[in-house]
A protein has these predicted regions:
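Substrate-binding/active-site clefts of carbohydrate-active enzymes
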Residues: 127, 147-160, 169-353, 632
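Short catalytic/ligand-binding loop motif for oxyanion handling, primarily in non-cytosolic enzymes
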Residues: 114-116, 174-176, 214-217, 262-265, ...
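Short glycine-biased active-site loop of nucleotidyltransferases that positions the nucleotide triphosphate
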Residues: 83, 216-221, 265-272, 389-390, ...
């Protein structure tokens, strides 16, 4: 039995063993509520009986014996045996003279006598691949100076704040022309260039893929072996702290991809950690993920839940990360996800819901909320599971936001169509509004949509090259006007032709080509308009924030709508044409008399801000069911945004 039985909490923090772990630590870990367990397990510089060295602790309840191995003892499994800590399943050892920067692993002897060399699950630093050892490190002592950002974060309501996310894979965003570590930018180098780019473009947040340590580049960081270790591809933990700190000082938030759904079977990782299933479900019908060939975390074990929940807090509190995007939530919620009939285990009610995963999410999100960190929890959930962003006390899962996968699929299907056929698929662009306020949504055009022969965003568009760019500008304008926060993957803001490849840099030379430069400038202007006008983000989850003007002009494939702010006085009007036919005198209905001034127009040629200055006084003439209207020369593939004066 690997789960600690429920007992009464110790009256005092009595020291046991070497004295670094108390009875209360043990109790809380067994209950799954030791949210600072990473300060106890793992490797920590300590002084014991007057001698400086390293304290090691690991949870391995099925082990026959455990030792610490490393460069400091010639990797001899018998050189530094660890002692069991009562009946907790925890082993500990103090080794004098071991300092920082030492390679180490745990040598775990199974009940069958086999020795497994495992990386430390709680290691904060790891060897650069193909090495698999953990590295002793102290993450304390970094001098943060982002206090103003952190204080604002605690008070802000992200649901009513602007959020335009730039999704980035650091290893392929840019590369240096140097042999060290395959030309990867370091965290410190990337901080400066990335912050400059993001700030200039108008993004509010960066979402980073693949920061937790992972052995295989091709997994993009979604098969993690070091949950507590920022990947050594780009530097040390404190250099990653520098990265976060620097972006915060520039007013840019940081979101990390986080993977509590599954983990790989690599020999040094969590799989069969002590010779038996420990972090994973023992029954392969629950513990094996058939689609990915990975292991599934056992959400019924308190110690496993503790490992994950403490890890979420670790990134948010120790590294000042502003949010976690939880990968593949659907695979956790459904017991039959990716499994054929007869190869999954129903819950106690005979259903396919994973009750343990549901409880885990509610616990996780309640803890993040309860610690008043101000951090966001974002669910990549691809089904219609209800209440993903509702609080647990209302029966929800407690996430801050949910990726709007339904909108993304409909939007891309529509945009890929030849313009002639769009009129037969008009509902693909209007349907999303029917459920836009059912959750707190993020509209995503992520890395998943520009790989595996799906084409880059620009190459999804129909027509000749110029038409592709005009289409994409119109599409991006529709996205910016639609309720929901925004996310775009790197390279898609300047029209990268190639699909994303994690092995090579983006084709930055394209950003100097006229059509690409024009697209990049237009998307940047969209982002700055987005940040400037609260109508585009204040009421994303409120029906009062959106009004169709004309959702039914399918024959001409034109959409018009209004976005409102909380005052109802600083509204924006969007008019978007998804055909190559210009409408020289397109009449738009509006609810109020006044002047409508153009603030952004994509045009059909190269975009120049202010080139198409236009304002019109609405007339008392019914149109689109509205009492007033005005006419506007709407170009082919034209997108226009007006403000009301």
């Amino acid at each position: 039995m690997t789960r600690t039985k429920k007992t009464t909490a110790p009256a005092k923090t009595k020291e046991i063993g070497l004295g670094f772990i108390t009875e209360l630590d043990r109790y809380l870990f067994g209950q799954g509520t030791h949210y600072k367990i990473f300060e106890k397990l793992g490797a920590h510089p300590k002084t014991y009986k007057g001698k400086a060295g390293m304290y090691f602790a690991v949870w391995a309840p099925h082990a026959k014996a455990v030792g610490v191995v490393g460069d400091f003892n010639g990797w001899d499994p018998d050189a530094a045996p660890m002692s069991p800590l009562a009946d907790s399943g925890i082993y500990e050892a103090f080794i004098p003279g071991v300092g920082l920067g030492e390679l180490y692993k745990f040598a775990i002897t199974t009940q069958e006598g086999m020795i497994l060399f495992k990386a430390d699950p709680y290691a904060v630093h790891a060897e650069f691949r193909p090495g698999t050892a953990s590295i002793t490190e102290d993450i304390n002592g970094f001098k943060w100076d982002d206090a103003a950002w952190m204080e604002t974060r605690k008070k802000a309501d992200p649901v009513k704040s602007p959020m335009a996310i730039y999704e980035v894979h650091l290893g392929s965003w840019r590369k240096k022309d140097r042999p060290q570590k395959e030309g990867y930018y370091t965290y410190m180098e990337a901080a400066h260039e990335l912050a400059d780019y993001v700030k200039k473009m108008g993004y509010t947040h960066v979402e980073l893929m693949g920061i937790a340590e992972h052995p295989y580049d091709g997994s993009w960081g979604y098969q993690v072996t070091g949950y507590y270790a920022p990947t050594s591809r780009y530097g040390t933990p404190k250099e990653f702290m520098y990265f976060v700190n620097y972006l915060h000082k520039k007013g840019i938030g940081i979101i990390l991809d986080w993977v509590p759904a599954h983990f790989p079977k690599d020999a040094h990782g969590l799989a069969d950690f002590d010779g038996q299933p420990l972090y994973e479900y023992a029954d392969p019908r629950k513990g094996e993920h058939p689609d990915w060939g990975t292991k599934v975390f056992d959400y019924s074990k308190n110690e496993v839940k503790n490992f994950l929940i403490a890890n979420a807090l670790y990134w948010v509190e120790n590294f000042h990360v502003d949010g976690l995007r939880v990968d593949d939530v659907a695979s956790m919620l459904y017991l039959d996800y990716g499994r054929s009939d007869g190869n999954w285990v129903p819950n106690k009610y005979g259903e396919n819901k994973n009750l343990e995963a549901i409880e885990f999410f509610r616990h996780l999100n309640s803890v993040l909320t309860g610690h008043l960190t101000g951090a966001m929890m974002i669910a990549e959930e691809s089904t219609a599971w209800p209440g993903v962003t509702k609080p647990p006390e209302e029966g929800g899962l407690g996430f801050t936001f949910k990726w709007n996968m339904g909108w993304m699929h409909d939007f891309l299907e529509y945009m890929k169509l030849d313009p002639y056929f769009r009129k037969f698929n008009h509902n693909k662009m209007t349907f999303g509004i029917t459920y836009a306020t059912s959750e707190n949504y993020i509209l995503t055009l992520s890395h998943d949509e520009v790989v595996h022969l799906k084409c880059s965003m620009i190459n999804k568009m129909p027509g000749l090259n110029g038409d592709k760019f005009a289409n994409l500008k119109a599409g991006y304008t529709f996205m910016m006007g639609h309720p929901g926060k925004k996310l775009l993957f790197m390279g898609q803001d300047f029209g990268q032709y190639h699909e994303w490849d994690e092995k090579v840099s983006l084709d930055w030379y394209l950003a100097d080509e006229p059509l690409h430069k024009d697209l990049q400038k237009y998307y940047s202007d969209l982002l700055h308009v987005y940040q400037k006008y609260p109508a585009l983000w204040q009421l994303d989850s409120d029906w009062n924030g959106f009004q169709w003007i004309n959702a039914n002009d399918g024959d001409r494939s034109i959409f018009s709508f209004i976005r409102r702010d909380e005052t109802g006085k600083k509204n924006l009007l969007f008019v978007i044409n998804f055909t190559p036919v210009a409408r020289d005198d397109y009449r738009v209905g509006v609810p109020k008399s006044g002047t409508y001034s153009l603030i952004l127009d994509s045009g059909h040629g190269l975009y120049k801000r202010g080139e198409h200055a236009f304002s019109a006084r609405s007339k008392k003439r019914e149109c689109d069911g509205q009492p007033y209207s005005f006419a506007y020369p709407l170009p082919a593939y034209g997108a226009a945004i007006f403000k009301f004066n």
